[in-house]
Amino acid sequence: MKIYHLYRRQHLNLTIHEAWKFFSSPYNLNDITPEFFHVTIVSRMPKKIYAGLMISYRMKAVFGISMDWLSEISHCDEPKRFVYQQRIGPFNFWSHEVCLTEEQNGILLEDIIFYAMPIGWLGQFINSVLIASKLEQIFDNRHNYLQRKWGD
């Protein structure tokens, strides 16, 4: 199984507590993702995330195909970092770590993503012609939205 990696970092002009409030809420996903990637939260959400929290989504991603996704907050260190991992969904493996580090005049946001495609060589091919570029689009959109909202 081939493991893929995506890493992004960005300086934002807000406090670590403001950043935590924004990034730890799955209700903000549609604000920071492109229109083709619409997310509906299916499960009930508590006021704060915690390690072990399961979140059920329905999303439209590639070609508008609707799919279910179940993720777990596997690690939560408020207000510094959290990790969510796919438990049920389109990938063989998905882990997204969000790290927030206080800096002068704001925070450093780091996104660390590891993922693996299903169906062997065919999944690797689909990743190379479609999925990798879609993920780049999603995180480019996220970067641009955040830059407009809290950028330098």
PLM feature spans:
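Hydrophobic ligand-binding cavity/cleft-lining segments
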Residues: 1-50
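Short, surface-exposed coil-to-beta transition loops
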Residues: 5-7, 66-70, 92-96
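Generic structural detector for well-ordered beta-strands
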Residues: 7-11, 40, 58, 72, ...
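Beta-strand elements of well-folded, non-transmembrane domains
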Residues: 12-14, 59-63, 75, 90, ...
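A short, structured loop/turn motif at beta-sheet edges
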Residues: 16, 74-81, 99-108
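Glycine-rich portal/gate segments that line the openings of hydrophobic small-molecule binding cavities
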Residues: 41-88, 141-152
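Beta-strand/loop substructures that line and gate deep hydrophobic ligand-binding cavities in soluble
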Residues: 86-137
